[in-house]
């Protein structure tokens, strides 16, 4: 079984997978979440892949259609590289016209945003303190409008509230748009940038009254006309963690696999096919 997967060329098997996805999912719409996953294995291998005391490691970056609940494709991250170089390769290999591509903070790069725009798609990308200047600017923009009662043309807001499991959760999505000026504000480091998004999450424990809040920031090529759609897209991004990566870890026990090299890459594709069937 292991030998069977080891003799198949990963590029060929990936092509078969992509063609199969096209048959199952005729058209991709809505949110396409992109995220990387480290596959750890106990086996040692040669210098072709990253090794260490923990043994074989394989980074795969996957694209997940949140609406269709299916993996659209994946690429291997080269050992001497990272997700930043792998993500554009994956995006360029997919038909994403009209989709909203969501990525964590690793995707907050000029080349990645340019690739998404060139594929006729939009993006929502998390921004964190590893991009210090951009993060501080985004935070300042959102903080200026977060708690204002008045809504002016450049600001829209969507509020949702959920009660359950002994707590009340309130989420406020604030979208601030300066249109084409936004790109200049960020010194053209993010292609197609139109809006900054702030998600303020407030949680109250009913029994104790304990209150916590957190604000997360995003950059997007979408304008501020549909804040509810943006809030929904950000929540849908987590489906790649819950419905793909978690299943690979728990159901298929990917981290306990003894497969290496081609076998590991091919079996990763096979498990994603199995999740859809």
Question: PLM features: what roles do these ranges have?
Answer:
Residues 1-47, 120:
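Active-site- or DNA-interface-adjacent structural scaffold in DNA-acting proteins
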Residues 128-235:
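An anionic, glycine-rich sequence signature occurring as long contiguous blocks
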Residues 1-18, 103-109, 116, 259, ...:
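Short, positively charged, Gly/Tyr-enriched micro-motifs
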Residues 102-110, 128-133:
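Acidic, metal-coordinating catalytic cores used for nucleic-acid/nucleotide bond scission
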Residues 235-277:
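Basic, amphipathic alpha-helical segments enriched in Lys/Arg and hydrophobic/aromatic residues
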Residues 32-37, 69, 87, 100-108, ...:
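Short, conserved catalytic/metal-binding motifs centered on acidic residues
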Residues 51-99:
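Electropositive, glycine- and tryptophan-enriched low-complexity nucleic-acid-binding patches
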Residues 113-121, 143:
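Short, surface-exposed basic-aromatic patches at helix termini and helix-loop junctions that form
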